């Protein structure tokens, strides 16, 4: 036997089992099936699987008991404490949600404050079929799928969503108020599809989209690739008749309007870029002076007035 193997067999760290201790590990003449007895049989595997299944079943039953206990506690706490919190006696929403008819004004309180699952399903159907994108209907469906949520939580969420929908309706009707307010200040105003439009110069602008006057006439539309540069040296393009800064476009639009290599441009586009560079170099001071003079023109006065009004209305100032 080699010296290294001899040392390993004699070491105290991993002693080799000998004589009586080694019985059953290796096949011998007296016990030829010793090694096969050590591997588990099919019967052992089946017993182990049965034990695992019983353990999982017990865990599931324990979880079900815990969920039911939690649900019962939630319902008890809702019946005891939530009547005063949500003012269920006087609220029309609570009458609609709970489906119990008008509540009496006396101190009588009904026993069943939490609606049944059928009532919740009917309420969800009512919301979903009237408007499929309604957030309250989606919330009710989520409550039906995830039954661990307590009804008091759902009720507060529905109240919040109702308030949000009301605020959204109010905001959508405030365009008329904007028009009246801007007309009262002496501006030429008209109502657009989504917001007010104010006339500055010979064009209509949304409040907040105005970024200073054009270098060229507005009828002179910018070329598709190059765009134009305004008095603030910001590149802008025309989108749906509005002046939009190039940096405020979404990434795909910027990518679509990116300038191709010089060799691909037509002669007209090359001349246009050269002219803009020429204006940058030779008209820089003149453009700055024109920017200062602009505030004293009629268009500048309208723009400043609109800026103050939009700052008061929207809580922010749009610096051109």
UniProtKB/Swiss-Prot annotation:
Family annotation (InterPro entries): MMTV_SAg
Annotated transmembrane regions: 45-65
What's in the GO CC field? membrane
One Pfam match, by short name?
A: MMTV_SAg
Compartments (UniProt record): Membrane
Give the positions annotated as glycosylation sites. 79-80, 89, 93, 131, 146
Question: Which segments does the topology annotation call Extracellular?
Answer: 66-320
According to Swiss-Prot or TrEMBL, what is its membrane topology? Single-pass type II membrane protein
| Record's miscellaneous remark | This protein is coded in the long terminal repeat (LTR).
Q: What is this protein called?
A: Protein PR73 3'-endogenous
What is the source species? Mouse mammary tumor virus (strain GR)
What lineage is on file?
Viruses, Riboviria, Pararnavirae, Artverviricota, Revtraviricetes
